[in-house]
């Protein structure tokens, strides 16, 4: 039995019978988070595509790539959004490498997250130079303006950073988005797309729970 089929997503409305208030309130929130505001629906759907690739929800990927296409996103724009997500997911792992360095060195500081720790990242250039250099090249090219602007990519990065929960990445890309011309309203809207997609990933997988529950 396949655990993922498009048709399973059709069971989602069944949740309305079992948790009606929560279901309706989520649908209302999700609709508002993805509606046009300072950011267009197209921009929000591209953010949603990126976040869906981080949550790993196949239902969300299918839905939001379709929505992005309906809102005139090109293959190239969708691909660029996905690569921002790829860079941010990988970047979250690398960024937390500074915590590993602190732990290895026996840093007794009770504060596990300080902005100053991020400066240790360059130490990986000496520890694993070729891999570090290759990642930096990939990260730089993924965030470089092309079919999507630098501002659009940094807003996607902000949403992705909130999805991975990387404090260093949130700090870096929020500042980058601001430098690229994003205002606080646009940044907030990008964050709420991430919030909706993280919640949506959990809800979407409820159809798998329904299938599992119904098995004899």
Residue spans of the language-model regions?
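Hydrophobic alpha-helical segments
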Residues: 1-216
